[in-house]
Amino acid sequence: MKATQTLIATTKELPKEAVLISHQYMLKAGLIKKLASGIYTWMPLGLKVLQKIQNIVRDEMNKAGASELLLPSILPSELLQETHRWDKFGPELLKLHDRHNRDFCYGPTHEEPIVDMARDTIKSYKQLPLNLYQIQTKFRDEIRPRFGVMRAREFIMKDAYSFHENSQCLRNTYNTMYATYCNILDKIGLAYRPVKADTGAIGGDNSHEFQVLANAGEDIICYSNGSDYAANIELATYAKPDLSKRVNSQNTIEKIHTPNIKTIEKLCKEMSFDIKKTIKTMVIKDAGGNFFALVIRGDHELNETKINKLDQIIAPYTLATKEEIFSIFNANPGSLGIYNCPISIIADYSAIAITDLVCGANEDDYHFTNVNWDRDVTNYQIADIRNVVTGDISPDGKGTLELTNGIEVGHIFELEDVYSKPMNANIIGQDGKSKPMLMGCYGFGVSRVMAAAIEQSHDENGIIWPESIAPYQVAILPINYNKSDKIKEVADKLYQDLLGDGIDVLLDDRGARPGVMFADADLIGYSHHVVIGDRLLEQGLIEYKNRKTQEKQEITIAELIKILK
C-alpha cells in the first residue's frame, strides 16, 4: 500500500478523557476517531490491525473444529424474555421499537438467538457436539464509557457457543477452547495468563478468564511463583494456616482507652500495635435481613464474591448502616469487636490464626488486647472471606502468591443448561429420552485485545505492535521521494520486490519532511523502518530500524531482505 492511497490521520490533539496510553495512541495514530460517547470509527490503519486479529482468531477457531456463522445484531424482545434477561440486563440493554411498535434490542451478547437457532435445527445427540462462532459488533449502553475501545459501548467480539449431550462432552470442548485461546494469544504475541474466574451474570459452572498482563489493567490477578496456579482475585484463595499450632496464651484480656481512634491504621500508629495482630470487624446484612460480623486481619480486605457464595449468606449482601450497627452493638463502626459479639461471627482463617489479638471493645473509644479464640470467643464460623495478598502460600502448597494487573480479553464458561433449559432447547439423547442440550460459551474481545496490546507494549514515541498484528510489517521511508529520481526508483523497486515476496509493506510517498515521516512511523508502530536517503544510497546502503529494539543498521538491500524473511 502507498501512503497516498490510504488515510494516515495522525494528530497531536487529544481529548481530556483520553487517560490510558492505548486510548491516546489510537487517537494520535489515527487508528480510531470518536463519533459519539463510547462509539468509534475504525480508520483504515486501525481496521487493518483489527482484521489481522480477526484472521488469527478465525484461523485458530477453524482449526479447533468450530464453524462460523453470523447472527443478527438486532434481537426481538421475546427471546430475552424467555430467559428473563430483558429486564435483568437493566439500562445497559439498548432497546428500540420498529414501526409496528414491536420491541427489539441491540445484542449485548447472543446466547438467546443461538439457542433459538439450535432448538429449531438440532434434534438428536447424533448432531452433537457442535461448536458455532461469530465475529460480531455488540452494544452495551455503559453509563460511563471510558478508556477508548477498552470499555466502549459498541465493540467487536468473537463469541462461540458449543452444544453437547453430556457434561464430559462439554468439558472436552471447554478444554479445546482453553487451548485455542492460548494459541490465539501466543500467535498474536502477547504476555498473558489464563486464570480461574467467577461466572458472573452469564451463569454456569466452570469459568476461566484470559488476562493480558499490563499495568493499566483494571483486574487484579494472582499467580503462584512455584506452580501453574492462577486466578482472578475474586476467586483466588490461599493455603490455610494450621490452626492446631496456635499457642495457648496465658495473657489476660485488657481493656484500653483509645479516644477518637476509628481506623486500624491510626490504632497501630498511636498505640504501636503490629497490624498483623489486629482484626477488623465489619457488619453486613444479607438479602434475608440477617446480620453477620465478618472478621479479617487488620491488613486484609474483604472479598465480596467469596462472601456472596457462602452458604450462610443469602446473596446479595450489603454493608450495615451506621444506625443499624449502633442499634445492635450500642457502639459505632471503628469500635466493634468479637468479644461478647451479639451477632453471628464469620471469621477468615488468617484472623483465626492470631493469638493475643487486638479488637474493638463494642464500646466507643475502647479496644481489647490479648483476646483469644476458643478461650474468649467460642461461637464463630470459619471461612475464606478475604482477598489474597502477595506472599500468601499458594493453595497447592507450591510457592507463594504474587499479584499483577491484567486486562481481560477472553472469558470461557461451562453454561450447562442455564439457557437451553428455560428455552426448551431439547434433544433426544442416546437413551431415547428428551433432555436439554448442555452448552459452553466462549467470548473473545477482538477490539479490546488491540488496546491491550498497546498497553502492554509501547514507548514514549508510540506503539510497539507484536509483528503479527502491526498495520504494516515494513514501512519504506524515502527522503525527498518526490524530488529525487534515484530515491524514487530505488524505493519503488524495493516496494514492488517486498510485495512480490508477500511482505505487508507501506511506501510513504507523501513527500513529507523526514521528521514527520519518522515520527509517524514510530507512533503508528510499523515493525520495520527502511530509510532511503542520498548519502547512504551513494554507498549502496539503506538505514534499517527495528521498531521494537530501536536498533539501527546501515545495510544493503540484500541484507534487509534476509532480515525481513
Swiss-Prot record:
<keyword id="KW-0030">Aminoacyl-tRNA synthetase</keyword>
<dbReference type="InterPro" id="IPR004154">
    <property type="entry name" value="Anticodon-bd"/>
</dbReference>
<dbReference type="Pfam" id="PF00587">
    <property type="entry name" value="tRNA-synt_2b"/>
</dbReference>
<comment type="subunit">
    <text>Homodimer.</text>
</comment>
<dbReference type="InterPro" id="IPR002314">
    <property type="entry name" value="aa-tRNA-synt_IIb"/>
</dbReference>
<comment type="function">
    <text>Catalyzes the attachment of proline to tRNA(Pro) in a two-step reaction: proline is first activated by ATP to form Pro-AMP and then transferred to the acceptor end of tRNA(Pro). As ProRS can inadvertently accommodate and process non-cognate amino acids such as alanine and cysteine, to avoid such errors it has two additional distinct editing activities against alanine. One activity is designated as 'pretransfer' editing and involves the tRNA(Pro)-independent hydrolysis of activated Ala-AMP.</text>
</comment>
<keyword id="KW-0436">Ligase</keyword>
<dbReference type="Pfam" id="PF04073">
    <property type="entry name" value="tRNA_edit"/>
</dbReference>
<dbReference type="InterPro" id="IPR004500">
    <property type="entry name" value="Pro-tRNA-synth_IIa_bac-type"/>
</dbReference>
<dbReference type="GO" id="GO:0002161">
    <property type="term" value="F:aminoacyl-tRNA deacylase activity"/>
</dbReference>
<comment type="similarity">
    <text>Belongs to the class-II aminoacyl-tRNA synthetase family. ProS type 1 subfamily.</text>
</comment>
<dbReference type="GO" id="GO:0005524">
    <property type="term" value="F:ATP binding"/>
</dbReference>
<dbReference type="InterPro" id="IPR002316">
    <property type="entry name" value="Pro-tRNA-ligase_IIa"/>
</dbReference>
<dbReference type="GO" id="GO:0004827">
    <property type="term" value="F:proline-tRNA ligase activity"/>
</dbReference>
<protein>
    <recommendedName>
        <fullName>Proline--tRNA ligase</fullName>
        <ecNumber>6.1.1.15</ecNumber>
    </recommendedName>
</protein>
<dbReference type="InterPro" id="IPR006195">
    <property type="entry name" value="aa-tRNA-synth_II"/>
</dbReference>
<keyword id="KW-0648">Protein biosynthesis</keyword>
<keyword id="KW-0547">Nucleotide-binding</keyword>
<dbReference type="InterPro" id="IPR033730">
    <property type="entry name" value="ProRS_core_prok"/>
</dbReference>
<dbReference type="GO" id="GO:0005829">
    <property type="term" value="C:cytosol"/>
</dbReference>
<dbReference type="InterPro" id="IPR036754">
    <property type="entry name" value="YbaK/aa-tRNA-synt-asso_dom_sf"/>
</dbReference>
<keyword id="KW-0963">Cytoplasm</keyword>
<dbReference type="InterPro" id="IPR050062">
    <property type="entry name" value="Pro-tRNA_synthetase"/>
</dbReference>
<dbReference type="Pfam" id="PF03129">
    <property type="entry name" value="HGTP_anticodon"/>
</dbReference>
<dbReference type="InterPro" id="IPR044140">
    <property type="entry name" value="ProRS_anticodon_short"/>
</dbReference>
<dbReference type="InterPro" id="IPR036621">
    <property type="entry name" value="Anticodon-bd_dom_sf"/>
</dbReference>
<dbReference type="InterPro" id="IPR023717">
    <property type="entry name" value="Pro-tRNA-Synthase_IIa_type1"/>
</dbReference>
<dbReference type="GO" id="GO:0006433">
    <property type="term" value="P:prolyl-tRNA aminoacylation"/>
</dbReference>
<dbReference type="InterPro" id="IPR007214">
    <property type="entry name" value="YbaK/aa-tRNA-synth-assoc-dom"/>
</dbReference>
<keyword id="KW-0067">ATP-binding</keyword>
<dbReference type="InterPro" id="IPR045864">
    <property type="entry name" value="aa-tRNA-synth_II/BPL/LPL"/>
</dbReference>
